[in-house]
Amino acid sequence: MIKITLPDGSIKEFENGVTPMDVAKSISEGLARNVISAAFNNITVEISTELTTDGSLVLYTWNDKDGKKAFWHSTSHVMAQVLEEMYPGLKLTLGPAIDNGFYYDVDFGDTKIVEADFKKIESRILEISKEKHEFKLRPVTKADALELYKDNEYKFELISNLEDGTITFCDHATFTDLCRGGHIPNTGIIKAVKIMSIAGAYWRGDEKNKQLTRVYGTSFPKQKDLTDYLELLEEAKRRDHRKLGKELELFAFSQKVGQGLPLWLPKGAALRDRLEQFLKKAQKKGGYEQVVTPHIGQKELYVTSGHYAKYGADSFQPISTPTEGEEFLLKPMNCPHHCEIYNVRPWSYKDLPKRYAEFGTVYRYEQSGELHGLTRVRGFTQDDAHIFCTPDQLDEEFKKVIDLVLYVFGSLGFENFTAQISLRDKENRDKYIGSDENWEKAENAIINAARDKNLNTVVEYGEAAFYGPKLDFMVKDALGRSWQLGTIQVDYNLPERFELTYKGSDDQLHRPVMIHRAPFGSMERFIAILLEHTAGNFPLWLMPEQAIILCLSDKYEIYAKKVLNLLENHEIRALIDNRNESIGRKIRDAEMQKTPFMLIVGEEEEKNNTISIRRHGQEGKGNITVTIEEFARIVNDEISKTLKTFEV
């Protein structure tokens, strides 16, 4: 008999050779009908795999992330089979599951895949699916594997780097592929498929290697799931931050300035400034001190911090001074600079914690093919802060940072999120620096803080940084997509590298603990996500322009200026549209700019010292006429519902 531990902690005994499917049947028939994959002792296995030792078992359905991963990986095998049939002579390379689907990188040789072929590929995949071919994993010797793929230099290279005894093939129908495993039971579960696109991709991601063709696809267990997904993609196109950024005149890019270097236009700069002032105000209440550091630093600074060794390939080339022979780097991180600020003077335990905050611009070299709007850029500004505290202060400081992150999310309409607690892999302690005692303190601080703040959490072992555990906030946007926003990290590494100290109550020198935190992450990426989440309808307090005054004709321009002055006295951001256009055109343009309030002024309004309000997106609901003071109350009441005061 063997003992199987289930996710709820219960332990069941089974005959040696039991399969995950057998375990599912012992739990419920419903689970047995829906289980498609499993993990045994944290290793993905098929549900037909015979289990011969004690261990922990997790069963996955389509609703689980790992279930989808197995589903999409299996579909990539079927697509590879079809591509091999349709394009004789091609060479398959790698075909993993990715977010929302899968891809396969292919060397098509002298042939070429075109979009017109997609429907044929989809139809053939579904034909094979209906035949319900089982996915079967089998071990092979390295010699046999190399023999099979002697004419495919890509698979040959992969196999050459594997150890004998670890190589497996996956068979279904007449198709065989090199694979480690993680498949659904059979092709019959695949009911809907869509080939999404093709793109160029270098072998193993190295631009020095041959460029292959990457074929992207997705699949689902129901046709309705695919239909819903495609509708979601259409909505995502409408919300694309690159499209909205151009339409709303927020930011632009210039080839002369350089790829991945956004230019913030007046309205976009105003939006950024509002976000910065919002966070600075909260940080001031939270005891943070603003600092400013240069855009460059000596290479030696980043060698000391370890960033150059780890991220040197992602940094721009060093800048050498003409005469002194010094080497500088465009700043890839703010934290080394903040360590040097801490080191300017000696500290006592009575002085701690020290909280340094900065909107610091950093630079990373991203390959041109990886750049994407504001989400992947080469220059970006982080809302960085670093807290230097004693080990005894760690718990309380961590909770305070969580409070700040929750305040930011609540003020900006991000209500659906999960906190991922990333801990070390205790089986591989050599991967991490610092004592077991410090690690346990830090991990417990994060776990306890998340519990005390009633966060919805998931725990990921082995996902901690080498220098300390962390808490990542995974936010779902209006389209149900998950984004990592807001990170809090505990760091024992940099205080050691920079020899940071404070004098304790025992008059001895001690190392402080360092906390990295960035609620936004980067201003560029955060604004991109916020744009797509809100479709450009930002919270009223954040809008660059909260109202626009529309004159029925130019003879009401003097009154419009009077209205503008009164609005400014109430700290309402507005402007006047006095163009020689029809009122209908002015309204349409204001709607396109997503201006929250259109204030129409004409003869009646001037006579009665009023304005006629039209709300964005409420066509056909009629206008209401109010005084300026009444309108100011409407605006302030709406803002007060979303923008609360940060309570320490």
From Swiss-Prot:
EC number in record: 6.1.1.3
Region (Catalytic): 240-539
Principal EC category: ligase
Keyword Zinc-finger: no
Keyword annotations: Aminoacyl-tRNA synthetase, ATP-binding, Cytoplasm, Ligase, Metal-binding, Nucleotide-binding, Protein biosynthesis, RNA-binding, tRNA-binding, Zinc
Any one cellular-component term (Gene Ontology): cytoplasm
Superkingdom to which the source organism belongs: Bacteria
Record SMART domains: tRNA_SAD
Cofactor: Zn(2+)
Catalyzed reactions per annotation: tRNA(Thr) + L-threonine + ATP = L-threonyl-tRNA(Thr) + AMP + diphosphate + H(+)
Gene Ontology terms for molecular function: ATP binding; metal ion binding; threonine-tRNA ligase activity; tRNA binding
InterPro entries per UniProt: aa-tRNA-synt_IIb, aa-tRNA-synth_II, aa-tRNA-synth_II/BPL/LPL, Anticodon-bd, Anticodon-bd_dom_sf, Beta-grasp_dom_sf, TGS, TGS-like
Domain TGS residue range list: 1-61
Main location: cytoplasm
A biological process term (GO) from this entry: threonyl-tRNA aminoacylation
HAMAP family attached to this UniProt entry: Thr_tRNA_synth (MF_00184)
Record function comment: Catalyzes the attachment of threonine to tRNA(Thr) in a two-step reaction: L-threonine is first activated by ATP to form Thr-AMP and then transferred to the acceptor end of tRNA(Thr). Also edits incorrectly charged L-seryl-tRNA(Thr).
Family from the record: Belongs to the class-II aminoacyl-tRNA synthetase family.
Protein name, UniProt field: Threonine--tRNA ligase
UniProt organism field: Flavobacterium psychrophilum (strain ATCC 49511 / DSM 21280 / CIP 103535 / JIP02/86)
Gene name linked to the record: thrS
